[in-house]
């Protein structure tokens, strides 16, 4: 039943296109476009085939022979004479003069072989040029008659359509919505960095790697992937609320795009407000010359976003400080032991690295760190 309705809708939509008059107009317009393309290509070919008259030169280099990195012997023809010249980096010396009557056998044989090789290519080029000139006239004649006999067709650009919803609001058509969606994808990295828990997590992971003394393990790709999936895990309640409150009504055409964006921003605002420190919010409010707010939901994004970022940076550095303390103690102990033993030339990081890794594994560091990060967010 669904297939029959689908094919019936397709036939109904295509029936106006294949109407006799409209179909003739479409075909005539298509023929005009093809004719313009052919004429334009022919004009370009003619323009590109124009050759600039070269300056007549009485001197011609016949052959060149390199005898070193910067030395060569050149055979030059000047009027009726052929000169053999020796060319170096500093000077040019005359070696011998050949009269024009004495033909160089080597050059003649070379020219003969080149003429034999290029004979077939030249014939093909001549054939293509003549065939183009002969057939181009016969190609243009039918299109001239077609243009003179066919009626003119005009194509109108489809306008940007909109739909009226049940509540009286207005929504744009699907192509416009698709364009807006694809444009919004360019802001996805900024959204991920400035409005989620990704900033705090990735900074803590980077500080952990520096505290361990392993700048290349784990690699950046592993840390970014772990931070990304942990961000989705922490933000999943917020994303689910955005999906239910904003996306589902918008997909069912119960809400327009503007209301959906406002409705979807409310859970993100609530998440960011729970992480923002009061001094940071007061600082940016003071810089924006805003004294007070009636409600937390009235705080604009231009104040909320920088306050959230600065709060996240401060929290991430505090967590990183607590991570550095045990590893710093290990470095100090190892350095003191090496100094006491007189091993001045041994770098302490080489000795302390195994102890740091052993400590991190014994306390189950990854589980402890991820658990602490997940509980550090006030959701």
UniProtKB/Swiss-Prot annotation:
Keywords in alphabetical order: Bacterial flagellum, Bacterial flagellum biogenesis, Bacterial flagellum protein export, Cell membrane, Membrane, Protein transport, Transmembrane, Transmembrane helix, Transport
Record localization: Cell membrane; Bacterial flagellum basal body
Cysteines paired by S-S bonds: none
TM ranges: 23-43, 140-160, 178-198, 222-242, 319-339, 357-377
Family: Belongs to the FliP/MopC/SpaP family.
Alphabetized Pfam families for the sequence: FliO, FliP
Listed GO biological process terms: bacterial-type flagellum organization; protein secretion
Principal localisation: membrane
PROSITE patterns for the chain: FLIP_1, FLIP_2
Domain of life: Bacteria
Originating organism: Buchnera aphidicola subsp. Acyrthosiphon pisum (strain APS) (Acyrthosiphon pisum symbiotic bacterium)
UniProt keyword Protein transport present: yes
Protein name: Flagellar biosynthetic protein FliP
Function: Plays a role in the flagellum-specific transport system.
Membrane topology term: Multi-pass membrane protein
Coiled coil: none
Alphabetized InterPro entries for the sequence: Flagellar_biosynth_FliO, FliP, T3SS_IM_P
């Amino acid at each position: 039943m669904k297939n029959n309705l689908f094919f019936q809708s397709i036939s109904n939509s295509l029936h106006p296109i294949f109407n006799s008059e409209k179909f003739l107009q479409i075909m005539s317009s298509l023929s005009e476009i093809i004719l313009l393309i052919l004429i334009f290509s022919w004009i370009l070919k003619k323009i590109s085939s124009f050759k600039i008259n070269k300056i007549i030169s009485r001197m011609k280099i016949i052959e060149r022979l390199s005898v070193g990195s910067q030395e060569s012997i050149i055979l030059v023809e000047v009027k009726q004479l052929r000169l053999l010249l020796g060319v170096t980096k500093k000077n040019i010396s005359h070696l011998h003069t050949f009269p024009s009557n004495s033909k160089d056998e080597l050059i003649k044989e070379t020219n003969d072989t080149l003429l034999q090789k290029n004979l077939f290519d030249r014939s093909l080029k001549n054939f293509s040029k003549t065939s183009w000139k002969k057939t181009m006239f016969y190609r243009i004649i039918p299109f001239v008659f077609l243009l003179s006999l066919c009626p003119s067709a005009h194509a109108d650009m489809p306008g940007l359509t909109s739909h009226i919803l049940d509540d009286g609001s207005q929504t744009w058509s699907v192509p416009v919505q698709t364009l807006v969606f694809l444009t919004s994808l360019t802001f996805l990295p900024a959204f991920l960095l400035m409005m989620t828990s990704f900033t705090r997590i990735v900074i803590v992971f980077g500080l952990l790697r520096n505290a361990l003394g392993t700048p290349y393990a784990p690699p950046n790709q592993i840390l970014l992937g772990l931070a990304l999936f942990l961000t989705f895990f922490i933000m999943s309640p917020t994303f689910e609320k955005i999906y239910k409150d904003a996306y589902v009504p918008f997909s069912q055409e119960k809400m327009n795009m503007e209301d959906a964006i406002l409705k979807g921003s409310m859970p993100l605002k609530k998440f960011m407000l729970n992480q923002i420190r009061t001094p940071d919010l007061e600082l940016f409010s003071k810089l924006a010359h805003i004294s007070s707010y009636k409600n937390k939901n009235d705080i604009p994004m231009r104040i909320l976003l920088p306050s959230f970022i600065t709060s996240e940076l401060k929290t991430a550095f505090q967590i990183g400080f607590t991570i550095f303390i045990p590893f710093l103690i290990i470095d100090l102990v190892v350095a003191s032991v090496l100094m006491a033993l007189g091993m001045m030339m041994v770098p302490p990081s080489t000795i302390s690295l195994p102890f740091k890794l052993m400590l991190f594994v014994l306390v189950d560091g990854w589980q402890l760190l991820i658990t602490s990060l997940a509980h550090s967010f006030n959701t």
